[in-house]
Amino acid sequence: MRVSDFSFDLPEALIARYPKAERTASRLMTLNGNSGAITDGVFTDIVAQLNSGDLLVFNNTRVIPARMFGQKASGGKIEVLVERVIDQNTALAHIRASKSPKVGNELFLGNEDSDVKVKATMVARHGALFELKFNSDESVLTILDKIGHMPLPPYIDRPDEDSDKERYQTVYNEKPGAVAAPTAGLHFDEALLERIKAKGVELAFVTLHVGAGTFQPVKVDEIADHIMHAEYVEVSDEVVAQIAKTKAAGGRVVAVGTTSVRSLESAAKAALDKNKPLSAFYGDTDIFITPGCQFQIIDALVTNFHLSESTLLMLVSAFSGYDHIMSAYQHAISQEYRFFSYGDAMFLTKQELIKQDTP
């Protein structure tokens, strides 16, 4: 398949630049992966979509304030986006500058209106990423909490605000490390989670630290030629046991967000590659899910609306069928659903592989 097969035109007005006042106030489109039937509703309808005995799997990563501004020793302005924290004093980062820093160059980071300035040294380059060593007694995460900005996606196209520190974060976040939110989870508040649990639905938590690569455009013509960026994943023994218990009792595994899908399916792929049953998985994944892929664990999916020609649009097309997804997106545009990170959501059921449709 070609990347252009996943293209659609989106009116600018449908890009959500701010969240709804209430987390649960978004709309919810339900798509049946087998029939293609679409139902329009509100996000709290998800309670009715879930059954007692289902397992709802969330990504508990915490978004770090990964964007920093500053200058080089020469005075040139720079923008730094931390991609991954390596240790207490070291991070890999993307750097925007008129001229890229060289090994040994010092960077001075901090807001113009603040007295807090931190010095970092560029110690190595790894492809598009720069390895920075922070010259401070404080950890990288502490430094980011002091001078960092929430790394809003480029399509939100506005400076971050104080409200984003709460709203570009799930209510159940636990493990810091992401530079983008697992956005399907933004629709849940504590009250909705309690309603879901009261129905007999069990909750499980995996970790995938979302990297900035999630926003990188696919730069090849054929999707088979695309190389995915790697992200760190944790799927615990406890989650593996919850999945086994759910499947044995006839329940469904429902992933909240494509990051939860990629976490669980990465663990399943690792087990399959070893010809062993599902087990805990800790490590990097570069899994790329496209139409024709067979899902080992996931039965249903909660997800936001994704960018044209993105790997995430390819993933949901693999899950619910290419034709069904592309038709659903046209329906969403005609009904003026809000798109992307702060936008509305979908509840998708899986299309059986024998009915998989690809162009």
Curated annotation (Swiss-Prot):
BP-aspect Gene Ontology terms: queuosine biosynthetic process; tRNA wobble guanine modification
Record-listed E.C. numbers: 2.4.99.17
Catalytic reactions of this protein: 7-aminomethyl-7-carbaguanosine(34) in tRNA + S-adenosyl-L-methionine = epoxyqueuosine(34) in tRNA + adenine + L-methionine + 2 H(+)
UniProt main location, coarse: cytoplasm
Gene Ontology annotations for the cellular component aspect, listed alphabetically: cytoplasm
Pfam families: Queuosine_synth
Annotated localization: Cytoplasm
Pathway: tRNA modification; tRNA-queuosine biosynthesis
Keyword Chloroplast attached: no
InterPro entries hit by this protein: QueA, QueA_dom1, QueA_dom2, QueA_sf
Keywords: Cytoplasm, Queuosine biosynthesis, S-adenosyl-L-methionine, Transferase
GO MF annotations, alphabetized: S-adenosylmethionine:tRNA ribosyltransferase-isomerase activity
UniProt keyword annotation of Cytoplasm present: yes
Family: Belongs to the QueA family.
Chain's role: Transfers and isomerizes the ribose moiety from AdoMet to the 7-aminomethyl group of 7-deazaguanine (preQ1-tRNA) to give epoxyqueuosine (oQ-tRNA).
Subunit relationships: Monomer.
Protein name, UniProt field: S-adenosylmethionine:tRNA ribosyltransferase-isomerase
Upper classification of the organism: Bacteria, Pseudomonadati, Pseudomonadota, Gammaproteobacteria, Alteromonadales
Name of the gene: queA
